[in-house]
A protein has these predicted regions:
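Alpha-helical transmembrane segments of integral membrane proteins
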Residues: 1-172
Length: 172
């Protein structure tokens, strides 16, 4: 619960700062994408943990799990054949929302100059580099990457909404 109170960008900046302090600049430039993935993953994992724990606790107390346990099915079989398939629906929905948030976090960090190096293509880097030309009449250098970023995040969120509506048996 404590990690949920820390903004994901701040957590990613902290992890990236620690990585920059531990490893050399050349090594950091080579491993920047992995550090970025780790930083965003560390900042986003509490949502997945909370949803999967809540869904597991709900499924664990259902009658079919008790019946499987009574007839002698092992805990691993109950977990992988009964509980895991039933908790995948909310995890997939949260995963699509998490993917959109991860893309926005990467673009934000790259825009701030903390993400991937300038030689690696990134929407945030393109937007940051286009800001230098924004007032010189070449607005499209910033506009099109920004619009693409917004449309990408919006389409992934629409996919998550569609999955939620399709996979939720209570809405059918």
């Amino acid at each position: 619960d404590v990690q949920l109170t820390v903004p994901s960008i701040l957590m990613a900046l902290l992890v990236d700062g620690i990585a920059r302090g531990i490893i050399s600049r050349e090594m950091h430039d080579e491993m920047a994408i992995y550090v970025l993935i780790f930083a965003i993953g560390i900042s986003e994992w509490p949502q997945f943990a909370r949803v999967s724990r809540a869904a597991t606790l709900v499924e664990k107390n259902k009658d079919y799990v008790a019946a499987s346990t009574i007839i002698g099915v092992s805990n691993l079989v109950v977990m992988f054949k009964h509980i895991l398939p039933n908790i995948m629906r909310p995890i997939l929905v949260i995963g699509t929302i998490g993917l959109a948030l991860a893309i926005l976090a990467e673009a934000t960090l790259s825009f701030l100059g903390v993400g991937v190096p300038p030689t690696t293509p990134s929407l945030g880097t393109l937007i940051r580099l286009g800001n230098d030309f924004l007032f010189s009449g070449e607005w499209w250098i910033t506009f099109f990457p920004a619009i693409f970023l917004v449309l990408l995040a919006f389409s992934i969120n629409l996919l998550g909404d569609w999955m939620r509506d399709t996979l939720n048996p209570k809405l059918n």
